[in-house]
Amino acid sequence: EFRRVLFRSLQDTVDVARQLLGKVLVRKIGNNTISGIITETEAYRHSDDPASHAYRGITPRNRAMFEKVGHAYVYFTYGMYHCVNVVAKSSRHPAGAVLIRALEPKSGLDLMKKNRNTDKISNLTSGPGKLAMALDITKKQYGEDIVKSKILYITDGITPKKIFASPRIGISAGLEKKWNFRI
């Protein structure tokens, strides 16, 4: 097993979004392991980011973004999808999280296909809601300590040769920030 990636220190959310690319997101369910290489992320900070859930302050939904780094912030959107984020913030920005937008499936393909009800590998984890569904990530994992957890964690993976940056997807504010990163 790859050693776990430790995100215990305060680091800028945008830097962590880049660092997560190429790492492996792992989900253990009983004796099954599902994993994928992180291929796309988005950074969401605090007071300088009107697209962030943390922009207007702490709420019951976003409280994880204000708490310990390295924990999961999972939220429900569009009435049907969960999205998984890793809390990452700096001393300058007291809240933040990195949305994991896409994965390249690595292990547990059969279970991913079953969870997503599709055989199309290219469609399994090609969006934040799809990957959460494929890895069976729900609000039950909200606040999960990704560094210490045995059911949801991140390990070393590959070193990206090139990282592409562009504006984030599906937002109406903060469009000038090129905080969508992909390999």
Language-model-detected regions and their locations in the chain:
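Conserved, well-structured core segments that form or line functional sites
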Residues: 4-183
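Short glycine- and acidic-residue-rich catalytic loops of nucleotidyl-transferase/cyclase enzymes
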Residues: 1
